[in-house]
């Protein structure tokens, strides 16, 4: 059963408003030719113009050339792998580090089974899922920031 209100097109007032371009078009507008011929090309050209403008105004820096005979003191991964790198770097046993990384998805799989409430509720009324999300976000940020620091300062973030 539909709950959408259908417009009464026999109403002369509504027809006059629609003829003037006023009011909402509840009954829809066909995609051909309006969107495909007019809207989509403008969006595509605008996106292309933004990309070209960004490439011209802010070209990518190439950096210094690589020297195969000089190894850096500490090799760091890309920024999005910092938390995983910090787990592997701070735990003494490699197997323990791999198990710690594997336990993260397993813990996330268990969250819906721990919290037995309606899944369509407000997220702030689901305390377990909200707490797990906030704790996981804080731990990920802590690990990511700590990975960029030297090993002796990484766990305390250099604060203590």
Swiss-Prot record:
Main location: membrane
Electron transport listed as a keyword: yes
Any Gene Ontology biological process: photosynthetic electron transport chain
Localization, UniProt: Cellular thylakoid membrane
Membrane topology: Multi-pass membrane protein
Residue intervals passing through the bilayer: 36-56, 95-115, 131-151
GO molecular function per UniProt: electron transporter, transferring electrons within cytochrome b6/f complex of photosystem II activity; electron transporter, transferring electrons within the cyclic electron transport pathway of photosynthesis activity; oxidoreductase activity
Keyword terms of this UniProt record: Electron transport, Membrane, Photosynthesis, Thylakoid, Transmembrane, Transmembrane helix, Transport
Keyword field contains Membrane: yes
The protein's assembly and partners: The 4 large subunits of the cytochrome b6-f complex are cytochrome b6, subunit IV (17 kDa polypeptide, PetD), cytochrome f and the Rieske protein, while the 4 small subunits are PetG, PetL, PetM and PetN. The complex functions as a dimer.
Protein's recorded name: Cytochrome b6-f complex subunit 4
Native organism: Nostoc sp. (strain PCC 7120 / SAG 25.82 / UTEX 2576)
């Amino acid at each position: 059963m539909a709950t959408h209100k259908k417009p009464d097109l026999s109403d002369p007032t509504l027809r006059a408003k629609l003829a003037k371009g006023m009011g909402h078009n509840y009954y829809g507008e066909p995609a051909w030719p309006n969107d495909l011929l007019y809207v989509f090309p403008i969006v595509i050209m605008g996106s292309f113009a933004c990309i070209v403008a960004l490439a011209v105004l802010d070209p990518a820096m190439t950096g210094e050339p690589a020297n195969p005979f000089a190894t850096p003191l500490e090799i760091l991964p890309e920024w999005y792998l910092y938390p995983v790198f910090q787990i592997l770097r701070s735990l003494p046993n490699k197997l323990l580090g791999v198990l710690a990384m594997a336990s993260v998805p397993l813990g996330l799989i268990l969250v819906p089974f721990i919290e037995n409430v309606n899944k369509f509720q407000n997220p702030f009324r689901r305390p377990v899922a909200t707490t797990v999300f906030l704790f996981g976000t804080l731990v990920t940020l802590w690990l990511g920031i700590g990975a960029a620091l030297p090993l002796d300062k990484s766990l305390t973030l250099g604060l203590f």
